[in-house]
């Protein structure tokens, strides 16, 4: 059980530390970061129940509908909703990079709980693949969501545009990720590897830009 718990949480902790330490202009209190992580972990349960309910009723049988609505939209919308109401309006959210920290923290909380349940069902031997793909992809969605929420918080003139992008882009990227898995199930790595490399490049650029704008 200890090894399974470690395998479920360790990738998220490593990624969270990576992005936390990338903050060049101050750091957030760990207490609030942990709080957003736990909110993300708890959020996974109602989202999972909702997804299973729709699947049980025969909705979203089409792979593209499943990828874009059931997985991409549902998961990213609820993460965005919780991030907006629990972190965006908080006094500690006072830099653009804070959005990245909180977005990554909440997303990795969600991914850790999802990862733990998957490992319980499928065995700890699947942990490496889970760390490299689903967990890291959730971190990247959190970076992008948080980056644009940070822009919205600090740049009132274009707030609506940044808020829309903070939801739309993570939904789009998450949906494309799941579409690759569903449509290219046997040979998905040929598409997924370049896709993930592009996602990581985008995430690192957002990290650099957020730090530059916070100067």
UniProtKB/Swiss-Prot annotation:
One of its GO terms (cellular component) is plasma membrane. It holds the Pfam family PrsW-protease. It is an enzyme of class 3 (hydrolase). It comes from Halalkalibacterium halodurans (strain ATCC BAA-125 / DSM 18197 / FERM 7344 / JCM 9153 / C-125). This is Protease PrsW. The chain crosses the membrane at residues 1-23, 31-53, 100-121, 130-151, 180-203. Involved in the degradation of specific anti-sigma factors. Responsible for Site-1 cleavage of the RsiW anti-sigma factor. This results, after two other proteolytic steps catalyzed by the RasP and ClpXP proteases, in the release of SigW and the transcription activation of the genes under the control of the sigma-W factor. Signal peptide: none annotated. GO terms for molecular function: peptidase activity. Residues 24-30, 122-129, 204-215 are cytoplasmic. Residues 54-99, 152-179 are extracellular. Its EC number is 3.4.-.-. One of its GO terms (biological process) is proteolysis. Belongs to the protease PrsW family. It is found in: Cell membrane. Keywords: Cell membrane, Hydrolase, Membrane, Protease, Transmembrane, Transmembrane helix. The keyword Cell membrane applies. It is a multi-pass membrane protein. NCBIfam families: intramemb_PrsW (NF033739).
């Amino acid at each position: 059980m200890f090894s399974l718990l470690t395998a479920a949480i360790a990738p998220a902790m490593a990624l969270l530390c990576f992005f936390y330490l990338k903050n060049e202009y101050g750091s957030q209190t760990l207490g609030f970061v942990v709080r957003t992580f736990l909110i993300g972990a708890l959020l996974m349960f109602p989202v999972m129940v909702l997804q299973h309910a729709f699947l049980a009723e025969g909705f979203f049988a089409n792979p593209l509908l499943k990828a874009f609505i059931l997985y991409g939209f549902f998961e990213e919308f609820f993460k965005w909703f919780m991030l907006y109401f629990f972190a965006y309006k908080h006094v500690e959210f006072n830099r653009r990079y804070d959005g990245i920290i909180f977005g990554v923290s909440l997303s990795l909380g969600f991914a850790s709980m999802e990862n733990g349940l998957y490992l319980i069902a499928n065995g700890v031997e699947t942990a490496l693949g889970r760390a490299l793909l689903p967990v890291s992809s959730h971190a990247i969605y959190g970076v992008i969501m948080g980056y644009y929420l940070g822009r919205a918080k600090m740049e009132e003139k274009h707030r609506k545009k940044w808020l829309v992008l903070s939801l739309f882009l993570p939904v789009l990227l998450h949906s494309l990720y799941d579409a690759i898995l569903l449509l290219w199930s046997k040979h998905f790595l040929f598409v997924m590897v370049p896709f993930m490399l592009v996602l990581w490049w985008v995430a690192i650029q957002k990290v650099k830009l957020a730090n530059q704008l916070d100067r």
